[in-house]
Amino acid sequence: MGYTSLIMRLTSFTDYTLRTLLHLGSNPGRLVTIQEIADMHNISKNHLMKVVHELGRNGVIETIRGRNGGFRLAHKPEDINIGAVVRQSESDFYMAECFDPGGNPCGLVKACALKGVLSNATKAYLAELDRHTLASLLPEPAPRDGAVPITFHRKESQAA
């Protein structure tokens, strides 16, 4: 049986969180606006306001208010761990209803090994995310074609 899609799926909130961080990482030091990201990624400004608020609350970005305000990364991209960001933005990692203590109890829970398998899969998924930083997800800067270093030489004055 072939599997063509992942079962583990991030919420839209986490997807937008990661897109926001990738956008900020691609624009180092520059203040970015919610409108800019909303237009670039076709995301609702209202959703992005929640994302930006949460990223600011978690100390991942810094926000500057005012007419010329915006937001930028609060840390270097290599210091932002993707696993940590996903854990902060996802409400839970329940793979099945039996994982949720408040969910519908399953009659098979005492004899079922599926919960252990899914738990291990979730741990492996998060471990993979932990291996990456924002820097590792950013594209390499494009080489500037034809760029040649310029060296300036000063003429020495002629001594008599």
PLM features: residue spans?
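C-terminal regulatory/oligomerization modules of transcriptional regulators
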Residues: 2-5, 82, 100-160
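Basic amphipathic alpha-helical segments that dock to polyanions
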Residues: 24, 51-56
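Short helix-capping/hinge SLiMs at alpha-helix to coil transitions
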Residues: 25-29, 75-76
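Alpha-helical residues within the helix-turn-helix
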Residues: 39, 56-57
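Key DNA-contact positions within bacterial/archaeal DNA-binding proteins
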Residues: 46
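Beta-hairpin "wing" of winged helix-turn-helix
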Residues: 59-73
